[in-house]
């Protein structure tokens, strides 16, 4: 009989989907297991017959499914306003590029966000965060990018820090100052990139407000040369990088980000084989964002088969934002990734667990159920992981465990 230490907590009688790639079973499934949690981490995984049937801090899950906590590795959670009117325009034939050229798109949200009080932004973002938590999310990336000026970018990152301080969910904050050219720099995008590189990145990094730098390398964003200035600035300071790339066209953004050992290349609908090979060589995760593909009614799908062939890890994220993916649901993103992009349900699960952790640089502590990893996991009223992907309108979450505590 396994001896427990004072303070240990046990979840027994579980069907465990570890998402550990070293296990041969689909999803890393193993039955009749018990998790021993100690000081917020998984201490051990043992057959339940090795543990007492009952006792203090022993939870009998009656055969329920347990998976790692979900990870949403790409969101734009902090913003004000909505862009419902633009959506209606698009349904009436206007393109995303046309709307952006008319002052809509990202800049419309920038105006609303700049005008919004920090406390209001916090309350809006907190409600969104808790919606994701209710689906089993335990680690969440939050990008800035709706300020496009130093003061408001800092305000957005302070909101992310305040959310993190609640200890309800892990937050990975990302500086996305190079999201779009603000109206006041419309005729001088290079001047805006200078502001980003010489002021925003170093000052906000010094304040410890973000973990990584992101950018939007696209025909309606920044060109390759401008994007590289951002990457060079970040890497000179030792800051991890990532990029929104190849969403609407093939510019070579994935190759660029991979050359700087980017954590991830996101969207990647127009990615080609050269870019896929560069991602493999750079250790860069491909992040699929099916919500934006669906909402923009795009037709160019990411090259999933190429990513498989080159063994590039593929993550899946909600891309929750007001303009192109107003879906605050990682379950829905998993379903869309399967239906629209052809992922298998197991690939979708890997995409919101171990591969999503890698996209945030957290692969040594998050995204799998293994001894030594964080005790972030979800108990489901389900028999198989595929059920969560199959029926996104139903949430079978039974219990969410964060840092070893039921939350």
Curated annotation (Swiss-Prot):
Localization in the cell: Cytoplasm
Binding residues for Fe(3+): 74, 76, 244, 319
GO BP annotations, alphabetical order: L-histidine catabolic process to glutamate and formamide; L-histidine catabolic process to glutamate and formate
Binding locations of 4-imidazolone-5-propanoate: 83, 146, 179, 247, 324
Record-listed N-formimidoyl-L-glutamate binding positions: 146, 321, 323
GO CC aspect terms: cytoplasm
Residues bound to Zn(2+): 74, 76, 244, 319
EC number: 3.5.2.7
Entry-linked Pfam families: Amidohydro_1
Cofactor(s) this protein cannot do without: Zn(2+); Fe(3+)
Top-level enzyme category: hydrolase
Chief localization: cytoplasm
Gene Ontology MF: a single term: zinc ion binding
Keyword annotations of the record: Cytoplasm, Histidine metabolism, Hydrolase, Iron, Metal-binding, Zinc
Pathway: Amino-acid degradation; L-histidine degradation into L-glutamate; N-formimidoyl-L-glutamate from L-histidine: step 3/3
Top-level division of the source organism's lineage: Bacteria
InterPro entries in UniProt: Amidohydro-rel (IPR006680), HutI (IPR005920), Metal-dep_hydrolase_composite (IPR011059), Metal_Hydrolase (IPR032466)
Cofactor: binding details: Binds 1 zinc or iron ion per subunit.
Function: Catalyzes the hydrolytic cleavage of the carbon-nitrogen bond in imidazolone-5-propanoate to yield N-formimidoyl-L-glutamate. It is the third step in the universal histidine degradation pathway.
Family of the protein in this entry: Belongs to the metallo-dependent hydrolases superfamily. HutI family.
HAMAP family listed in its UniProt record: HutI (MF_00372)
Protein name per UniProt: Imidazolonepropionase
Native source organism of the sequence: Salmonella heidelberg (strain SL476)
